[in-house]
UniProtKB/Swiss-Prot annotation:
This is Na(+)/H(+) antiporter NhaA. GO terms for cellular component: plasma membrane. The gene is nhaA. It is a multi-pass membrane protein. Belongs to the NhaA Na(+)/H(+) (TC 2.A.33) antiporter family. The chain crosses the membrane at residues 14-34, 59-79, 95-115, 124-144, 154-174, 177-197, 213-233, 261-281, 290-310, 328-348, 363-383. Keywords: Antiport, Cell inner membrane, Cell membrane, Ion transport, Membrane, Sodium, Sodium transport, Transmembrane, Transmembrane helix, Transport. GO terms for molecular function: sodium:proton antiporter activity. It catalyses: Na(+)(in) + 2 H(+)(out) = Na(+)(out) + 2 H(+)(in).
Amino acid sequence: MEKAIRNFLSQESAGGILLLVAVVFAMLMANSPLSGLYQGFLGTDVQVRVGALDIHKPLLLWINDGLMALFFLLIGLEVKRELLEGALSSVAQASLPSFAAIGGMLVPAGIYLLFNYGDPVTQAGWAIPAATDIAFALGIMALLGNRVPVALKVFLLALAIIDDLGVIVIIALFYSSDLSTISLAIASVAILGLVGLNRKGITALTPYGILGLILWVAVLKSGVHATLAGVIIAFCIPLRAKDGSSPSEHLEHSLHPWSNFLILPVFAFANAGVALGNMSLDTLLSPVPIGIALGLILGKPIGVMLFSFIAVKLKLARLPDNVGWMQIAPVAAMCGIGFTMSMFIASLAFEQADPMYGDLARLGTLIGSFIAALVGYFWLSKVLPKKGV
């Protein structure tokens, strides 16, 4: 198990570096004479027509609705594996990261709403600081190598996966609108087909892919966010075949490099380009960016630590073996790395609002995530034993 986790984290570390490069490249383009080219590229109309089906969207939305559906497929596969066989497969294992994740979502959301009280437009962004970027957080931890106890790595992995599950629920409940009955009916039929494949023990991935594509189109047209189709598909793919092989894990391993080295960097490049030319100090300290940044920097660690402490004191959970509060605290700070997940929620929260709100949300996310990453890394490095000790 330790070797598998190390392999996973080493890939996350490399992907995290590429993510950072994509963000820097996007910011440079958005604040240079190339800004027109950058915005024009993302606004390029892309149309797909098959018979009566016509999907017509700018490139940015193809990235956010299409590529990110594959990322959520990967998240769904990870969640299912951890629930059935991994770090969340028993109450004892799942209790502490579950309480930590709940606190890590509620407190940042509360801080954001505190700064945006009374404004119905900006209040829509309450879930932005509630997210944790699993790839980036694990990548930062991976930089510390084998100094990090395996139990601490598993705790962060489990917490981040539960956080992702919370984000999925939030998207389904709060960021769906103008629902289409016909599209939802088609989606329901596709889901029944996927469940039927699972129940019959079909392990070939092609039938799941065909029905999954139909489901994605139906969900895209339904008013429910299309990324949720990826999660549904993941939950329907069998974890184990009769011969002991795992179609789910095979697909998960195949998707990981695509996610780390293509999907997430492309998403970051498309969404992180914030033009700073017209922004003043007053703008940076306005309710949206300050609420998000403080939610990530302060809300995440406070929420994770507070709910974890209460759960342990009430004997509802216990600390992992060989892990103390001094090690949990910097990991809680790392949970403030919202990055791609926070930017994704921002794109949903302010989709119909003035583009300025989206820029402010992305800026708050970048500032908060960057500070959380620095604090978490140096804090954890300080409390862990030195190499060779």
